[in-house]
């Protein structure tokens, strides 16, 4: 039980760090992180489309992030390694954040979703799925799913081959959840796939969206 509590605590901590970095590094094209324990402390790999923004002038921002990770989140001797995302259009986290930013700028949710989906597919993705959940058009909350191409949906392939990302858009009507899943060009297609040759859209129930 103690081991289970430890892993739960570490998972929650990583989630909180991810949320913090998403807010702090939106302009950097933040694409997620990986935390690894080492004999010397904690290695934190930050993936970003613009590593220079994460590092900051003279390394100022990365030093500040290091202090926050140590003092606020309790990481032992954190060592930050910033890795560049070669193609942000194939990183689901980056795309989820960009869609959220578009919604916050007042762009209609369908336009934001289809624009992102088109750009993702044009960059070679085998498939993409975008889910927007919340008060999209009025007082009633709903979830709309946009999808195209080939996407592993279940089992190990869905966990290992598909890039997944989540972000939130803060609007006057409330919070809009943005989920993005992308199957990259080099993914080997499993048996369990969904094939949609043309862009499609459907409204799904709130329960299903969860």
Curated annotation (Swiss-Prot):
Residues 17-86 form the KH type-2 domain. GO terms for cellular component: cytosolic small ribosomal subunit. The keyword Iron does not apply. Belongs to the universal ribosomal protein uS3 family. PROSITE patterns: KH_TYPE_2 (PS50823). GO terms for biological process: translation. Binds the lower part of the 30S subunit head. It comes from Pyrococcus horikoshii (strain ATCC 700860 / DSM 12428 / JCM 9974 / NBRC 100139 / OT-3). Keywords: Ribonucleoprotein, Ribosomal protein, RNA-binding, rRNA-binding. The lineage of its organism: Archaea, Methanobacteriati, Methanobacteriota, Thermococci, Thermococcales. This is Small ribosomal subunit protein uS3. Part of the 30S ribosomal subunit. InterPro entries: KH_dom (IPR004087), KH_dom-like_a/b (IPR015946), KH_dom_type_2 (IPR004044), KH_sf_prok-type (IPR009019), Ribosomal_S3_C_sf (IPR036419), Ribosomal_uS3_arc (IPR027488), Ribosomal_uS3_C (IPR001351), Ribosomal_uS3_euk/arc (IPR005703). One of its GO terms (molecular function) is rRNA binding. It comes from the Archaea. Pfam families: KH_2, Ribosomal_S3_C.
């Amino acid at each position: 039980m103690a081991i289970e509590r430890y892993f739960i605590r570490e998972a929650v901590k990583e989630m909180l760090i991810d949320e913090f970095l998403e807010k702090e590094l939106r302009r950097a094209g933040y694409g997620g992180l990986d935390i690894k324990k080492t004999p010397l402390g904690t290695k934190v790999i930050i993936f970003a489309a613009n590593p220079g923004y994460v590092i900051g002038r003279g390394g100022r921002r990365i030093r500040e992030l290091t202090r926050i990770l140590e003092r606020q989140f309790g990481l032992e001797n954190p060592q930050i390694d910033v890795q560049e995302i070669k193609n942000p259009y194939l990183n689901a986290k980056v795309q989820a954040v960009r869609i959220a930013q578009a919604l916050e700028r007042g762009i209609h949710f369908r336009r934001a979703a289809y624009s992102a989906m088109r750009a993702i597919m044009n960059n070679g993705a085998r498939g993409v799925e975008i889910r927007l959940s919340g008060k999209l058009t009025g007082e009633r909350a709903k979830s709309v799913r946009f999808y195209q191409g080939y996407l592993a949906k279940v089992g190990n392939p869905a966990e290992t081959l598909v890039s997944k990302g989540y972000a939130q858009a803060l609007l006057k009507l409330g919070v809009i959840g943005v989920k993005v899943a992308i199957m990259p060009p080099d993914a080997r297609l499993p048996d369990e796939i969904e094939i949609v040759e043309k862009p499609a859209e459907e409204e799904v129930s709130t329960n299903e969206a969860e």
